[in-house]
């Protein structure tokens, strides 16, 4: 928590929640670019939105069980689709036009996909469009924080390897410091989505939150439909 508070320029108590921490992170990021942030509005969460994909378990005893983890899934999807409140164009397509299920079954009308390809935009599985001509502040922050995490995780692994070779006790402090920093970066990355879907957040937007979750559903479900030596069973 102390590492996150120092890095985000926030009070210690602010990192125990999600919205205040990310509000200040975004403020400092935009201030460097001379961009004025919008006024905070009182917003009520009146609608529900699709969450993460949860596969129904296959009850029984199984051999050769495996698991997989998509590296920083939501942060990478934010970067991939350029998902950000100010890059959101709107949602011209409804569930009958596009959804995770329709994309998996190739049931989206060709004229919709052809039209998207002609424009400089991305289309998320909830039918939302995001502009690509300018990078959003959320993808920019995701990229910066992710790159920092990769850097400090590499330094931690290098310090661990050096300690194995030399047994120098001083390296333990380096290992602990680098691990602490990279873990703080990881928590920061994964908490951004939670802020977007929180109605107390300055940049709260259900379309943006759902764009992230449905894109995650699509990525995970594609693993089950991709050709492989053995069908994935869960």
Where are these regions (language model features)?
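Common nucleic-acid-contacting/processivity interface regions adjacent to the catalytic cores
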Residues: 1-85, 91, 170-217
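Conserved catalytic alpha/beta cores of large enzymes that bind or transform nucleotide phosphates
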Residues: 97-143, 150
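Non-transmembrane amphipathic alpha-helical segments
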Residues: 145-159, 185
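Conserved hydrophobic/aromatic pocket- or pore-lining residues that grip, position, or stack substrates
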Residues: 149, 189, 220
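Short amphipathic alpha-helix segments
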Residues: 217-223
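Conserved small/polar residues in nucleotide/adenosyl-binding loops
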Residues: 224-229
């Amino acid at each position: 928590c102390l590492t996150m508070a120092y890095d985000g320029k926030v009070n210690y108590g602010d990192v125990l929640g999600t919205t205040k921490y990310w509000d200040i992170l975004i403020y400092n990021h935009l201030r460097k670019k001379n961009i004025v942030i919008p006024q905070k509005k009182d917003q009520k969460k009146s609608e529900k939105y699709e969450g993460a994909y949860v596969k129904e378990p296959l009850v029984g005893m199984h051999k050769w069980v495996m698991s997989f983890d998509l590296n920083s899934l939501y942060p990478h999807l934010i970067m991939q689709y350029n998902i950000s409140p100010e890059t959101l164009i709107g949602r011209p397509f409804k569930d009958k036009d596009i959804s995770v299920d329709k994309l998996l079954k190739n049931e989206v009308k060709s004229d919709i996909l052809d039209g998207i390809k002609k424009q400089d935009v991305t289309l998320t599985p909830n039918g939302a469009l995001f502009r690509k001509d300018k990078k959003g502040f959320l993808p920019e922050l995701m990229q910066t924080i992710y790159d920092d995490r990769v850097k400090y995780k590499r330094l931690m692994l290098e310090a661990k390897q050096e300690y194995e070779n030399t047994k120098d006790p001083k390296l333990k402090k380096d290992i602990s410091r680098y691990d602490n920093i990279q873990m703080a970066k990881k928590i920061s990355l994964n908490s951004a989505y939670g802020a977007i879907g929180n109605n107390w957040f300055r940049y709260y937007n259900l379309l943006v939150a759902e764009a992230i979750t449905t894109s995650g559903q699509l990525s995970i479900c594609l693993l089950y439909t991709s050709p492989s030596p053995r069908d994935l069973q869960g």
